[in-house]
Design a protein with these regions (language model features):
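Short glycine-enriched loop/turn motifs at secondary-structure junctions
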Residues: 1-2, 55-59, 98-99
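Core segments of cupin and vicinal oxygen chelate
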Residues: 7-46
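N-terminal beta-strand motif that seeds the catalytic metal site of vicinal oxygen chelate
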Residues: 1-15, 62, 121-127
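Conserved beta-strand in the GNAT
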Residues: 46-48, 106, 116-118
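Short, charged/polar, Gly/Pro-enriched secondary-structure boundary elements
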Residues: 43-47, 55-56, 113
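Short glycine/proline-centered loop/turn elements that form peptide/ligand docking sites
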Residues: 33-36, 97, 124-125
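Short aromatic/hydrophobic contact patches that present stacked aromatics
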Residues: 5-7, 37, 61-63, 104-106
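Vicinal oxygen chelate
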Residues: 12-14, 63-114
């Protein structure tokens, strides 16, 4: 079983979809209806929806296992776009920490969503 897609509420589907696709190194597929579609990998599409741009939205959190080159590239593009990142979902200290033998940081966007980047995957079981 694989996750096919998830819908993320945003204020401007097209601008947001293009920016996050650029920063994360994903593919902007285009806009259909109230959603901007972004291909993350072969099996996952994120749909950024602005059906109700004035709605009281809750922030979402997404975690991605990335390699060292992806980690560095994403942070470089995020800084160029004016995005902040930090050692947790609330910190914008422009730092990363170590987790399970790899670097980890949290990108913060203007919508309140956070994107966790982890060089080491989550452990297979809780200790």
């Amino acid at each position: 079983m694989e996750l096919d897609h998830s819908v993320v509420p945003v204020k401007d589907k097209e601008a947001y979809s293009k920016q996050i696709a650029h920063v994360m190194g994903w593919t902007f597929l285009g806009v259909r209806g109230s959603q901007g579609h972004v291909r993350v990998n072969d099996s996952l599409v994120l749909r950024f929806d602005d059906k109700d741009p004035n709605a009281n939205r809750k922030a979402s959190h997404y975690a991605f296992h990335v390699d060292a080159g992806e980690f560095d590239g994403i942070l470089e593009r995020a800084k160029a776009e004016g995005m902040t990142y930090g050692t947790n979902t609330r910190e914008a200290n422009m730092e990363w920490n170590d987790l399970h033998g790899g670097r980890r940081t949290f990108l913060h966007d203007l919508e309140g969503h956070s994107y966790e980047l982890m060089e080491a995957a989550s452990p297979p079981a809780l200790d």
